[in-house]
Amino acid sequence: MDELRWYHITVCLDHIFGHNCSLSCKDCMNGGKCQEGKSECSCPAGCRVILCNENCLEGAYGAGCTSECQCVEENTLECSAKNGSCTCKSGYQGNRCQKDGLWGPEGWFSSAPCENGGQCNKKTGNCDCTPDYTRKSCTILRCISLTNLALSRRSSPMKYQQNVSSHREVRQRQQCSSDRPFKKLLCKFSFKIGM
């Protein structure tokens, strides 16, 4: 024999909703309005859940928080829960914070292009150059990179000799002398350029 099953269904009157009809339209918060025939409030952009009493979860926006933010997360400070607009971190721009761009407080300055392998520092706007280059855009080759430093103390005045080479085969012999240690050195340079 078939077993009878009983179901209990509660039907709420208009403008009453929720578990056991315990909520009414006057309970909607943050400007939420009662939806006809639905058991929840119609929430304004940026609010969610039955009474519109919670903000959208991170990464969601719009009415009922049903839309997903499209901001590039690592370049973004905030995605607006109301309209999904992106507030970019310093050093980024674009409607999704997807482009390199402005840097500094409030994005006041434009980044100069870095050359010769330099990387733009998004916080300062300066180029972090490779060891062989210098200046704002890493365009000036550092001519002197020390490869050997020989210190000889044969007699006074002290003499320092450096054999120096650079990226472009500029060879230099430098002799520096000083009457006393730790005083300003007087230096003479001679160059031999080979290609």
Curated annotation (Swiss-Prot):
UniProt entry tagged with the keyword Amino-acid biosynthesis: no
Source taxon at top rank: Eukaryota
GO molecular function, one term: scavenger receptor activity
Gene3D superfamilies per the UniProt record, alphabetical: Tie2 ligand-binding domain superfamily
Protein name per UniProt: Putative EGF-like and EMI domain-containing protein 1
InterPro entries, A to Z: MEGF10/SREC1/2-like (IPR042635)
Keywords carried by this UniProt record: EGF-like domain
Keyword Transcription regulation in record: no
EGF-like domain: residues covered: 86-97
Organism for this UniProt entry: Homo sapiens (Human)
